[in-house]
Swiss-Prot record:
This is D-fructose 1,6-bisphosphatase class 2/sedoheptulose 1,7-bisphosphatase. Pathway: Carbohydrate biosynthesis; Calvin cycle. It comes from Synechococcus sp. (strain CC9311). The lineage of its organism: Bacteria, Bacillati, Cyanobacteriota, Cyanophyceae, Synechococcales. It is an enzyme of class 3 (hydrolase). Pfam families: FBPase_glpX. InterPro entries: FBPase_class-2/SBPase (IPR004464).
Amino acid sequence: MDRTLIQEILEIVEQAAIASATLSGKGLKDEADALAVDAMRKRMNQIQMKGRIVIGEGERDEAPMLYIGEEVGTGTGPGVDFAVDPCEGTNLCAYSQRGSMAVLAASDRGGLFNAPDFYMKKLAAPPAAKGKVDIRKSATENIKILSECLGLAPDELTIVVMDRARHKDLITEIRATGARIQPISDGDVQAAIACGFAGTGTHCLMGIGAAPEGVISAAAMRALGGHFQGQLVYDPAIAQTSEWADMTKEGNLARLAEMGITDPDKVYEASELACGEHVVFAGSGITDGLLFNGVKFETDCTRTSSLIISNLNNTCSFTNTIHMKDGAQSIALN
């Protein structure tokens, strides 16, 4: 992937963010997601590449666009695999809450783990703690290690955890160490990536979230040099979600076996979830969040705030883009 393609990848998430932001705060999460999907696919199909969706909106019979296995792009040029979430945090967008964004990971062919639509136990931490914290250790042990790596007392650490019933015991354990909890209602990708940057006030992400988003987070953290591990969750008793009300542990294990996953308890490192030679992460804010602002609509323009990370040349770019409207008369700098 060259610099031109990386710029075009940035434009993919910008267009998706703008599209879904038109419905931000209107309580229409499915409609906002559909607009983002359409905008993302439209921009992808304008790019000279042989693109393929490996993580998308669902299986081919479940999603009309950006389904798993769908080919995107013009059909000529480099082969690129994509893991996409056109509107991460649909509820956040629908109710104009912080943290919704359009996001994707891209890599050369075969460079992204084809994660099943399961849940995943995740651990994200700053580069200083890479390889020292471990998802197999208790939260108490990891907070002690994190404290030593960052030179901060436990009560100076902030741990992000999704606000779910399944995390009740985890939250109790974290609080017993003295560390602070920052609960989030949806969308853990931005929280995971924030752990890779100093000064965000976010030091660690713990808990269970969606597996596909784990791959996207891993791509970003690999490029940042941060720590990310994931472990698939297949037991409904652990996931504790109504979405799995009709599923069984045995049935989920059988499904994983059908997908070729022979070790369902394997702990995946970031370099295994995003193993490509060249890995790119791109995200654009729909609503304001930890890392960037959301879309701003003005009289003569629309403003987007985005982030793109590439391991090709170890770059991380925060980009504020002004999308001028036809006939624009005056554009303010800020």
